[in-house]
Amino acid sequence: MCIRDRAELEEHLKDATSPQGKIYRELIRRIQIRSAQPAFHPHATQFTLQLRECFFGFWRQSRDRQQSIFCVSNLTNEEQILEVTELNLIKNQVWRDLLRESVVESYQRAWAVKPYRTLWITNSAKAV
């Protein structure tokens, strides 16, 4: 499908069932989540993670050191297993995936990360 002009694009973006509308709504949702997290502040600490080749990841920490976020993306077209030990999560904290809005259970040893999926794992989720 080739969208030829702005008006046509805007119609597709308004349609919640169109591929463009779905992507647009997800981008807005992610921007809102990201904007609410202190660890995503421009002056927050950031380090890249040393992960297997199938993943790209980085760790961010808020300036007050109260929030950490591990951002990990599966760069392949196959499901990959991410071991919890690869992230060095602090065990006495509750960790959540901001994008899935789910708690990471303390007994979990690994996550199955779908192709091209991204995780934002945090110890201190701020409400959107």
Region roles according to the model:
Residues 4-128:
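Carbohydrate-interacting/catalytic domains
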